[in-house]
Design a protein with these regions (language model features):
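Long alpha-helical rod scaffolds of large eukaryotic non-enzymatic complex subunits
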Residues: 1-434
């Protein structure tokens, strides 16, 4: 379909969506008669031409599309409402609310220890957990938070396991989806597919943040046991912490390398990917909203407004013309997030998931240590898991390095891989491993 066909299709769908809406916008549910007359006049003039010119048709369709966009922006939605929705997604889908993220992880850890194995978990239980996690955080008084919910996914659902949703069951071994109840008119630019992508990113970020917090707690636990053991005079113990090459020293090294990797990955997805792309999207919506506000203040004919819009050049960022542009821009933003989180690469996602599982196993072993004594079996298990972790991280580093050079699977060498590799290898740490 050419651009004219796309524009005409947009006009039809946009107007039909408003007319069929269940919300009380009846008095504004149809285009003004003056606007209809203006559009009809343009079309009649075009049809009366002796010679057909494609450029005239394109100009006419552009005028009509921009006029309809102005009308939609006024009676349906404003840029502020869109940004409020995006900020809610940023806070909860993308873990922008740090206090809530920590509380949510804690609630899930409590659920794992208190829930009998084999007991079926229900949506109501998870949503009660969600409410408890919000207590004492900024989410508690956030009205947008009420629209979020958990859902236990049916194993018979289509496309149950894909490259992007493989992190759904890493938390409590039950496939969970974090969802949002989208309402009209926000569904003009947020589709069901978009919400599914947000759910995929949430599962990945939750798994990453949970592992990060757990490693930090284990580090604190080892520090406490070290201080406790330093008060004892067990200098004859071959396994004490201060012996060079001792099992306890190996534990610190393993934890340090794991925390470094997880911290690099978390910092990359939050700062280099999510925050950067979020700011760009919000900026485009802001300048688009400002432009629409400016049009409303100017008391000039509609066709003149279109000419003004075409002559307005914003050097920094191109504004969105209408909701279809916003929808496309938002979909592009989500695609950039998925690529930046490496979720579009099954190989990379699989390596990250295996690395997180290994970190979990290490934490499970070390959480049981209550003294400076390191059992031989624990020492051997940690050594084995550390080797597996090293293999996965080395494989991931080599894969990313190869993708960065060749651009395979990403449509060209993406800049975000440069940023991630720089974080990981700024001191040649992973180059030595590789």
């Amino acid at each position: 379909m050419n651009q004219d066909g796309i524009d005409v299709s947009y006009l039809k769908n946009a107007i039909a969506t408003v007319r069929n809406a269940t919300k009380p916008y009846e008095k504004n549910s149809t285009l003004p008669r003056s606007l209809n007359s203006l559009h009809l006049q343009h079309l009649l003039e075009l049809s009366s031409r002796v010679v057909f010119h494609q450029i005239e048709l394109e100009n006419t369709v552009t005028i009509i599309r921009n006029n309809v966009a102005q009308w939609l922006w006024q009676v349906v939605l404003t840029g502020d409402k869109i940004i409020e929705c995006l900020e809610a997604f940023r806070n909860y889908f993308l873990f922008g609310q740090g206090d809530f993220a920590i509380s949510l992880v804690d609630q899930f850890e409590k659920l794992k220890t208190s829930r009998p194995k084999g007991l079926t978990i229900k949506d109501q239980e998870l949503n009660s957990l969600l409410v408890r996690a919000s207590i004492g955080t900024l989410a508690e008084n956030d009205s947008s938070f009420e629209k979020f919910r958990f859902r236990v996914q049916n194993v018979n659902d289509k496309q149950f396991v894909t490259r992007t949703n493989m992190f759904d069951n890493i938390t409590i071994n039950v496939p969970l989806r974090f969802e949002y109840d989208i309402e009209w008119p926000l569904d003009l630019f947020v589709t069901t597919e978009d919400l599914a992508k947000y759910g995929d990113i949430f599962s990945f970020l939750f798994s990453l943040r949970r592992t990060q917090i757990r490693l930090q707690k284990v580090w604190t636990h080892l520090t406490i046991t070290e201080k406790a053991s330093s008060n004892n005079n067990n200098n004859n113990n071959n396994n004490k912490l201060n012996d060079n090459g001792s099992p306890r020293l190996i534990l610190w090294k393993v934890l340090s390398s794991m925390m470094f990797f997880i911290d690099c990955l978390w910092g990359h997805v939050q700062m280099d990917i999510i925050e950067t792309n979020f700011r760009k999207l919000v900026h485009r919506i802001n300048i688009s909203s400002a432009q629409h506000q400016q049009f409303r203040k100017l008391k000039i004919p509609e066709h003149k407004k279109i000419s003004y819009a075409n002559e307005t050049n914003l050097v920094e960022t191109e504004p969105f013309r209408d909701f279809e542009d916003i929808r496309i821009g938002h979909s592009t933003y989500l695609s950039d997030l998925l690529h930046g989180c490496l979720l579009e690469s099954r190989v990379c996602s699989d390596a990250i998931k295996k690395s997180l599982n290994i970190c979990d196993q290490i934490c499970g072993l070390l959480e049981r240590l209550n003294s400076n004594m390191v059992d031989k079996n624990i020492s051997e298990s940690v050594t084995k898991l550390e080797k597996e972790f090293r293999e996965q991280v080395t494989f991931l580093f080599r894969t990313l390095s190869g993708l960065n050079k060749k651009g395979e699977g990403f449509g060209g060498p993406p800049r975000h891989l440069d940023q991630l590799l720089l974080r990981l290898d700024y001191s040649k740490y992973f180059s030595v491993w590789s």
